[in-house]
Amino acid sequence: MQTYGNSAVTYGWWAGNSGVTNRSGKFIAAHAAHTGLIAFWAGAFTLFELARFDPSVPMGHQPLIALPHLATLGIGFDETGTFVGGSAVVAVAVCHLVGSMAYGAGGLMHSLLFSSDMQESSVPQARKFKLEWDNPDNQTFILGHHLIFFGVACIWFVEWARIHGVYDPSIGAIRQVEYDLNLSHIWDHQFDFLTIDSLEDVMGGHAFLAFLEITGGAFHIATKQVGEYTKFKGAGLLSAEAILSWSLAGIGWMAVVAAFWSATNTTVYPVEWFGEPLALKFGISPYWVDTVDLGSAHTSRAWLANVHYYFGFFFIQGHLWHALRAMGFDFKRVTSALSNLDTASVSLK
C-alpha cells in the first residue's frame, strides 16, 4: 500500500487490505473467507427468495435475484419453464451453504494455523505464491492461475448448456444448446452484445473465452519477462495499491456492462424470469425504470440493473482513488490546502 516514504505508517482497522499486503498467507485466508461470505449469501438468499416466491405471480414481477438465474439455468423448473417444486433449488442453496462453511474453515486455517507468509512455507509449491508486488514474473504467475480458473468456469457453463440445457425464451422451454464457434460472429458481437439473440452465439463466446483464458493462463505461468524490467515497462509503478486499483476498475466495468445488458436483453435475461425491458432515465445519475406498472413493487430486472450500475459506479471511484495513490498523489494535501484557504496569501514580489 502507498506509504509516501513513511516506513512506519499505520492504517485504521477498516483498511483491511493493508493488513494482508505483505502477508501472502493472510491474503489467501482473506480470499477464502470472502468466498465463504459470497457462497453463504447465495445459499441463504436463495432460501429466503424461495420462501417468498409466489407461483401465481410472474417471477419477473417479484423482487427476486437468485431464483431467476436458477430458472434460466433450468433448475427448479421443467422443460416448459413451469415451477415443479423447490427440491432442486433447496439442493443448490444447501450446497452453497456447505461450501461457505468449507471456505470459512479454510480461511481460518490459513489465518490461524498456516504461515502468514508463503515464503516461510515448508511446501515448495506454496512458496511460489509469495507476494512480490513489484516483480512482474511473480504477479503474472499468480495471474495465470486466475485466468485458468476463469476458463474452467466458462467450460462448465458451456457444458451445462450443452448437456443439461438452459431456458430459451424464443420457444418458452429448456433446451440443449450447442456452442457456435464462428469467429466472425464472436468478433461482431463485441459491438452488439447488448442485443444478442442467439444462445448458440452466447455459448460460442464463452467457449472462445475459455480457450483464450486457459491459453493465456498457461502462457503467464510458463513464461517470464524478456529483458530488463525498466520504468518503461512499469518498474516502480507496479504495487499492491496499483493492482488493487486495476482490480476495482475491472469489476466496476463488468458491473456497468452487466447493468446495461440486463436492462434490455431478453435472451440472456428472459422476460418470464426478469420482467419486461427497462427504460433508461437521467437524473443526478443514470437509472432504469420499469416499463410496466407494478404499483410499489419493481421487477427483478429493475433491481438487477440498478444495483449493478451503482455498485459499478462506486467500484470505479475506488479505482480512481487507489490509482492516484499508487501514482503518488497524496490526498492529505487536498485537505491541507482547503484548511489553509483563510490564511493563504499571494505575494506580488
From Swiss-Prot:
Transmembrane parts of this sequence: 27-47, 57-77, 89-109, 202-222, 242-262, 304-324
Pfam families, alphabetized: PSII
Main location: membrane
Keyword Translocase among record annotations: no
Transmembrane helix among keywords: yes
Compartments (UniProt record): Cellular thylakoid membrane
One Gene Ontology molecular-function label: chlorophyll binding
Keywords: Chlorophyll, Chromophore, Membrane, Photosynthesis, Photosystem I, Photosystem II, Thylakoid, Transmembrane, Transmembrane helix
Alphabetized InterPro entries for the sequence: PS_antenna-like, PS_II_antenna-like_sf
Any single Gene Ontology cellular-component annotation: plasma membrane-derived thylakoid membrane
Source species, domain of life: Bacteria
GO process terms (BP): photosynthetic electron transport chain
The protein's required cofactors: divinyl chlorophyll a; divinyl chlorophyll b
Membrane topology: Multi-pass membrane protein
Task of the protein: The antenna complex functions as a light receptor, it captures and delivers excitation energy to photosystems II and I. The Prochlorales pcb genes are not related to higher plant LHCs.
UniProt miscellaneous comment: This low-light-adapted strain contains 7 pcb genes.
Annotated family: Belongs to the PsbB/PsbC family. IsiA/Pcb subfamily.
Oligomeric form and interacting partners: The antenna complex consists of divinyl chlorophylls (a and b) and divinyl chlorophyll a/b binding proteins and binds more divinyl chlorophyll b than does the antenna complex from high-light-adapted Prochlorococcus.
Identification of the protein by name: Divinyl chlorophyll a/b light-harvesting protein PcbA
